[in-house]
């Protein structure tokens, strides 16, 4: 039994040894096949870890709920009714967006602006490391203390439509971890502006926006102006051209308290093309037509009383235009607008031209009555030579030329006795006609009578022509010609007078 048990134990040991060797070999090959996969998975996990590390380096990982905790932390330490301790410096930046218009009659300017205010409040600081790396946050303005900075010369303030919508939700201020607060908002302000109307419509205006604190003096709040002006969002105005935007820091006393103030001065120049085209040019055309109508000679016989009506009509037109301008500009008792002065000048010129027409009509009427001016006035108007010249022809009698004289006398019975003298040297009549030639002489006399009747008819025609010439001379005598020269002279004089001012105005435009 002892040997048998020993053999059984030996056989069992051998079988178990073989089984263990087989399982070890299989596990070895299994492990050798899985090893590359495990190594690859390990390498992949390392690369993914590096990528996550890089992402975390570029974008800080915020802890959820940090913004809420930060807001609660800041509001718990801050009192909206308590200003920061010590002297507070406020940097004020104003960006001009658009000039909505200038009301000359009310002396106001309306502008659209963007406002940025910067100040530091130590009670609104935090450590970004304690709040998930947050370096800035936003809190509504009605939850923190804000300096009471207003526009001192403001007449009216209008809120924008989208600004009203935002105010119903919240008006946030940007707060940085070091306590710097940035408050931005758009606004439409109507400010008072002293309008100088002396050179209207060629005027330049300067309007200021005065920024200051209402309750705090400069021992508590000092304003600092941002000098770099950005006109990136500026939209040009069709009537006003922006010349310059100047910023200055000033001080003034308000109710016994010295206050720090920032003044934004806007320099503008009016674009006068609209007024030149709609008012100045029509006024010039009316004056020029009136002057030409007053002095142009369309007739030399009729009177010209109707031209006074034309002059009065032009004067009334100038008065209406001046009223149109006076309704737009302020009613000042110190200065007269340039455009109104131009209309008054035209009224005076047309009035003087109408009175001058009366003088010309008086001179013309003297000519129609047949009066003649003196040689002095004729020479003054270049109607006669200035220097006298003698054009008389000299005649000399030729003693050798015979002269015949026919003496005609009328007898009672109608007979005509004709005597012929041959020379003036006292030669007597040689002989009396023979009776034999009497019949021939009578025939000759009959022909002479017919000839005389023809001459008489021709003389009557000459008299009629002389009468017509006399009438013509009466209508174009010296005074009439002088009146013509006066018409031409005054027409060019007054046309030049009304043309030069409008040419200067258009040149300055």
Curated annotation (Swiss-Prot):
Disulphides: 193-207
Pfam families: Neur_chan_LBD (PF02931), Neur_chan_memb (PF02932)
Signal peptide: 1-21
Transmembrane regions: 276-296, 310-330, 336-356, 488-508
Keywords associated with the record: Disulfide bond, Ion channel, Ion transport, Membrane, Receptor, Signal, Transmembrane, Transmembrane helix, Transport
Membrane topology designation: Multi-pass membrane protein
Tissue and organ expression note: Expressed in the posterior body muscles. Also detected in the RIFL, RIFR and RIS head neurons.
Subcellular locations according to the entry: Membrane
Gene3D superfamilies: Neurotransmitter-gated ion-channel ligand-binding domain (2.70.170.10), Neurotransmitter-gated ion-channel transmembrane domain (1.20.58.390)
Disruption of the gene: reported phenotype: Loss of posterior body wall muscle contractions (pBoc).
Topology Cytoplasmic: residue spans: 357-487
Family indicated by similarity: Belongs to the ligand-gated ion channel (TC 1.A.9) family. Acetylcholine receptor (TC 1.A.9.1) subfamily.
Function: Forms a proton-gated ion channel with pbo-6 that is activated by acidification of the posterior coelomic space, leading to posterior body wall muscle contraction (pBoc) during the defecation cycle. Probably by regulating the defecation motor program, required for fatty acid uptake by intestinal cells. Does not bind neurotransmitters such as acetylcholine, gamma-aminobutyric acid, glycine, serotonin, glutamate or choline.
Record's subunit section: The functional channel is a heterooligomer of pbo-5 and pbo-6. May self-associate to form homooligomers with negligible ion channel activity.
Name assigned to this protein: Proton-gated ion channel subunit pbo-5
Gene expressing this chain: pbo-5
